[in-house]
């Protein structure tokens, strides 16, 4: 594992930095894997030029598994982001132990514990993607030592069942200091969405649109190579 591998890869990217998500299930759209081998999707993402790979380990709502995260980290040289509803330091330790590069920390869940969890994750060599959805959450996030701040265009409190779009990124990203890598998450389905997001953010995290596509690699390649 390269220390802070994801934020470094985004900073150094020559093309559009897309964190491509292997998303098994969506509360809104149901089964996204549709019988496909997730490792074949991983290979497709690698070949199409993803800057990193995201995977949701939450089992209850997104049908992910920690065991597959372990497999993923062994199978790819790309930085891997673990997404989950992290509430304990033990989960951070486990994330680092299996070789992930980054961990999602949700401001709404951690609240006052956020700075402490960010520092703990960084001590373990992990990039921290601190997720925000409101201006008040952003005020908390920018007080931390996080390497990255993610703007979730959808409301995780509603399990992404809402129709959020990149307009939230356009509002919040300009308020984030340059020392943070800014990531626009969720609600990016078209080239126009991506262009709007990357005009104000450093990277985009895309899952549902890629997983719903008949040819995820083809769509990702289009996103990675698009003129912004």
Curated annotation (Swiss-Prot):
Annotated CDD domains: IGPS
Catalytic activity: 1-(2-carboxyphenylamino)-1-deoxy-D-ribulose 5-phosphate + H(+) = (1S,2R)-1-C-(indol-3-yl)glycerol 3-phosphate + CO2 + H2O
Keywords per UniProt: Amino-acid biosynthesis, Aromatic amino acid biosynthesis, Decarboxylase, Lyase, Tryptophan biosynthesis
Keyword ATP-binding: no
The EC number(s) this enzyme carries: 4.1.1.48
Gene Ontology molecular-function annotations: indole-3-glycerol-phosphate synthase activity; phosphoribosylanthranilate isomerase activity
Pfam families the UniProt entry points to: IGPS
UniProt cross-references to InterPro entries, sorted A to Z: Aldolase_TIM, Indole-3-glycerol_P_synth, Indole-3-glycerol_P_synth_dom, Indole-3-GlycerolPSynthase_CS, RibuloseP-bd_barrel
Superkingdom: Archaea
SUPFAM superfamilies: Ribulose-phoshate binding barrel
One Gene Ontology biological process: L-tryptophan biosynthetic process
Involved pathway(s): Amino-acid biosynthesis; L-tryptophan biosynthesis; L-tryptophan from chorismate: step 4/5
Keyword Cell inner membrane: no
Alphabetical list of NCBIfam families matching this protein: PRK00278.2-3
Protein family membership: Belongs to the TrpC family.
The name this protein goes by in its record: Indole-3-glycerol phosphate synthase
Species this protein is from: Pyrococcus furiosus (strain ATCC 43587 / DSM 3638 / JCM 8422 / Vc1)
Gene name as annotated: trpC
């Amino acid at each position: 594992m390269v220390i802070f591998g994801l934020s470094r890869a985004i900073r150094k990217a020559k093309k559009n930095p897309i964190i491509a998500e292997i998303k098994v299930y969506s509360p809104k759209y149901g089964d996204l894997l549709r019988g496909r081998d997730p490792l074949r999707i991983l290979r497709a993402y690698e070949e199409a030029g993803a800057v990193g790979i995201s995977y949701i380990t939450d089992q209850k709502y997104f049908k992910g598994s920690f065991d597959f995260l372990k497999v993923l980290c062994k199978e790819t040289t790309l930085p891997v982001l673990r997404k989950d509803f992290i509430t304990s330091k033990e989960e951070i330790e486990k994330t680092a132990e299996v070789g992930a590069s980054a961990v999602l920390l949700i401001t709404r869940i951690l609240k006052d514990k956020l700075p402490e969890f960010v520092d703990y994750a960084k001590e373990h060599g992990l990039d921290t993607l601190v997720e925000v959805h409101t201006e008040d959450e952003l005020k908390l996030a920018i007080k931390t030592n996080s390497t990255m701040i993610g703007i979730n265009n959808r409301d995780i409190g509603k399990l992404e069942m809402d129709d959020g779009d990149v307009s939230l990124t356009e509002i919040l990203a300009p308020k984030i200091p340059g020392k943070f890598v800014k990531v626009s998450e969720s609600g990016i389905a078209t080239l126009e969405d991506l262009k709007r997001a990357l005009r104000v953010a450093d990277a985009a995290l895309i899952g549902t649109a890629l997983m719903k596509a008949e040819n995820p690699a083809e769509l990702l390649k289009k996103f990675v190579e698009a003129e912004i």
